[in-house]
């Protein structure tokens, strides 16, 4: 049975009570207030719904994740990544990254990144919880990703690319940077062939929640999410 959330409370039912079909559906309702969203991600729960739906909350089993030191890099991607034209930045253009992700998904299959979602995540960004990674090619935005920080875990929400391989390079370089500074886990929610080809693995929900709980016992260094251009791969 799906739980209807109490508008006056930010609490959620235990993730283990989520439905088997559709996989991971846990609750409906509530809002996208910063407090509720932060609490959800800390519990391994995330919102995912279309414009015509009520707010739906999920915690699927299994859960797809990346371990930062296990991103798969093909020869061609490694060669592309070495080109000096690429540059990475962090938190330099959050709103544009989110909107680019929304536009890319809308072109393919319709987007769940609605205006309501964009506004909610921009608020989280202003509060220091939501972050973007930008990849530039010859000083033009070429791709990127965004997500939510939960201690030393990063809950990825979406990626986009204007240029071939740009989103892969964003993930690869971010994972290297994240690992070097103590990052432990990159959540990618629900796996697909593309994510698995890059090194994502499925964890049983119970194991994922255990790792998420461990990761959020410590914060990333204070300067980690500071908006800036980041060094070249060999200097990360």
UniProtKB/Swiss-Prot annotation:
Compartments in which it is found: Cytoplasm
Q: Name one GO molecular function term.
A: leucyl-tRNA--protein transferase activity
Q: What is this protein called?
A: Leucyl/phenylalanyl-tRNA--protein transferase
Under which EC number(s) is this enzyme classified? Answer: 2.3.2.6
Q: Which Pfam families match?
A: Leu_Phe_trans
- The protein's organism comes out as Idiomarina loihiensis (strain ATCC BAA-735 / DSM 15497 / L2-TR)
Q: Which GO terms describe its biological process?
A: protein catabolic process
Q: What does this protein do?
A: Functions in the N-end rule pathway of protein degradation where it conjugates Leu, Phe and, less efficiently, Met from aminoacyl-tRNAs to the N-termini of proteins containing an N-terminal arginine or lysine.
Q: Is the keyword Acyltransferase in the record?
A: yes
Family stated for the protein in its record: Belongs to the L/F-transferase family.
Q: Which of UniProt's keywords are assigned here?
A: Acyltransferase, Cytoplasm, Transferase
